[in-house]
Each structure stands twice: as structure tokens, then as C-alpha cells.
Regions:
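Membrane-interfacial entry segments at the cytosolic side of transmembrane helices
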Residues: 70-79, 126-130
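Hydrophobic alpha-helical membrane-insertion segments
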Residues: 11-23, 77-101
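Alpha-helical membrane-inserting segments
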Residues: 18-30, 58, 62-66, 88, ...
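Hydrophobic alpha-helical transmembrane segments
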Residues: 49-56, 117-141
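Canonical alpha-helical transmembrane segments
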Residues: 47-74
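Transmembrane alpha-helical insertion/packing segments
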Residues: 1-52
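Interfacial non-cytosolic loop connecting adjacent transmembrane helices
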Residues: 29-46, 90-130
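Cytosolic juxtamembrane helix at the C-terminal end of the final transmembrane segment
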Residues: 67, 134-154
Length: 154
């Protein structure tokens, strides 16, 4: 597999950090609205549109630029590494959020790329653990769709 096991986790974490910075420092301002009474709030619909646009950008850039020469098997195995990291650190942050709150924030920065998935599941009022399982397990495998059927490396 030519040492490709790290590519999906590294790409997704780097993309997540960039998405987080864009949301907090730039794009999030678009979702801030002033209500008729003068109070300031965030518009959930705008935030979801912004998150969906970032998700699509991350998937398209990853799929068409970074993973297009990898086989589907390589991408699948690399995505499995990210799933394991999601589950291990997701459970860790859930259990230890009061003890290590800064790690919880740090981990959320590194998993921001697919936040639209958990936002949509929240809108569906799914059970908290079912939502977490879906959000942790499924999104990394979307990149498999962009892989080649056979090894093109020679």
C-alpha cells in the first residue's frame, strides 16, 4: 500500500483546521444576524449552508487533487485509520471534557471538515450516540468514491 495509510487522516485534519479558522475568523460572520429587538444571534440555516459548502469543497479538493491516484483499497484503509482516531479520541473527549477542556477544543478543530453531518443528524433529532457513531464512522469513506479501481502507479 506504499505507506498511504496516513493520507486521509492527515488531509482531513489539515482541512478541518483550515475550515475551523475560516468559520471562526471569516465565514462565520455571514451567519451572524441582528434580530428585530437588537440582539445578535447566529442563523442556523446560514451556518449549515456554510458548513455544507466547506464540506463539499473539502471532499472535491481531496477527491480530485489528493486522492485521485490512490486505489479505492488504499483510500479505504486510510479512511479506516481516521475512523479509529475519530472513535478513540471522540470517546476520550466525551469522557474527559471536564478534565481536559482544551483538548476537546483542539480535537474539534481537527474534525471540523465533516461538521455538516452532525448538524444534519442533530436536525433529525437522532439519539446522541447514534449521531456520534454515524458522524465518526461514515464521512471518511466518501473519498473512496474518487479512487481508481486498479493500481495506476505501475
Amino acid at each position: 500500500m506504499k505507506q498511504s495509510w496516513w493520507k486521509v487522516p492527515l488531509y482531513c485534519m489539515a482541512a478541518s483546521w483550515i475550515c475551523f479558522q475560516l468559520e471562526v475568523r471569516l465565514l462565520g460572520r455571514w451567519a451572524i444576524v441582528t434580530l428585530p429587538d437588537g440582539s445578535i444571534s447566529s442563523d442556523n440555516t446560514r451556518w449549515m449552508v456554510m458548513s455544507a459548502a466547506l464540506f463539499l469543497a473539502v471532499v472535491c479538493i481531496g477527491g480530485f487533487v489528493f486522492f485521485r491516484r490512490m486505489t479505492r483499497k488504499e483510500i479505504f484503509c486510510s479512511a479506516c485509520v481516521l475512523v479509529v482516531l475519530n472513535v478513540v479520541f471522540g470517546l476520550f473527549t466525551y469522557k474527559m471534557q471536564r478534565v481536559f477542556p482544551s483538548f476537546t477544543i483542539f480535537w474539534s478543530e481537527l474534525t471540523e471538515w465533516d461538521s455538516i453531518v452532525s448538524q444534519l443528524l442533530f436536525q433529525l433529532d437522532l439519539n446522541e450516540w447514534l449521531s456520534a457513531a454515524i458522524a465518526w464512522l461514515l464521512p471518511p469513506y466518501i473519498f473512496v468514491l474518487f479512487g481508481t479501481r486498479h493500481d495506476v502507479h505501475g
